Amino acid sequence: MLLYRLGQQPHIASTAGLGGLYSDGRWHEVGTPILYTSEHLSLAKLEVLANAATLPRNYFLLTLEIADHASTQYLEVADLPPGWNGLPYRRETAQLAQSWIQAGTHWLLRVPSIHSPNEYNCLLNPLHPDHAQLRIVSTEPHPFDARLKQ
């Protein structure tokens, strides 16, 4: 199974989830190593564009491969607390993912995108033993079409 991630150098090359150590997110608290990926490149793009005030520049695409049978915990919209998709981030939502990481049972947590709830992002726990099986397929420049932010 392929997963996609967009970001800038030098951070895009790391799969250690170090960004979670420095800032919080919808699915984690500060100090938590976590790697955000998307099941589709188009969703990865949507996630970046939704959080960018201007057209992202100097972005790279990281394509990852994991086994189709990778241990995964699934969350659907019905499993999430009211307001899970609002701002500021809900503490309850981050706590769901914190519990997943602390349990250490599953390598991936598959969560709905707030921008397209019928599509999914996959969060990877870099502390899980299966993370050693993660394979980098490619890292390549990925420019955004100027028409996406006018």
Set out the residue ranges of the language-model regions:
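A short, exposed loop/beta-hairpin motif centered on an aromatic-Gly-Thr core
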Residues: 31-37
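Active-site and NAD+-binding cores of ADP-ribose-processing enzymes
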Residues: 2-16, 27-30, 55-150
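Contiguous, structured surface segment used for ligand recognition
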Residues: 41
